[in-house]
Amino acid sequence: MNKILVTSDTHGHVAALRQAIVQAGEFTHFVHLGDCTADVEAVRPLLEERGVPVYQVRGNCDYSGAELYREFHLDGLKIAILHGHTQRVKYSLLSLGLFAEQKQADAVLFGHTHIPKVEYSSTGRLLFNPGSLGEPRLGQATFGLLLISREGIMPRIVQLDAVH
């Protein structure tokens, strides 16, 4: 069983990102979906201590050399990650669902809207947004956890505890 900590839209709130890492407990992979990739560098030592692979993409507020799109495989499932602004996710998830189909991804993880969402495309592909740790639109900072096994993917949105 793999457990992925999924974060997005931290926008300089490194303390919230650190809190999510602590609150998530043990996890096998770390994903940051952009805005701001520099925040990942601030917590990279924590992630390296745990021996956790880091996957990140850049968002519309990032100017780093990070890629716009990445994918990886876990337990025979294909996970695609992107920020979402190029797919216009603030307006509709239709193009994201088509993108998932085109890439043959079992799950597409995206950010940009600052609103957590667990949805499935018309072909049953997971479309997952962990919300925002830095500037949540619904008032509560959130992150995501994905439990992945050969049986499938169990998505979960988690509210961030108070940052100390």
Where are these regions (language model features)?
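N-terminal active-site segment of His-dependent metallophosphoesterases
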Residues: M1-R50, D62-L68, Q140-T142, L146-I153, ...
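Helix-adjacent hinge/juxtasegments
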Residues: P53-L94
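Binuclear metal-dependent phosphoesterase catalytic core
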Residues: D75, L98-Q104, S121, F128-H164
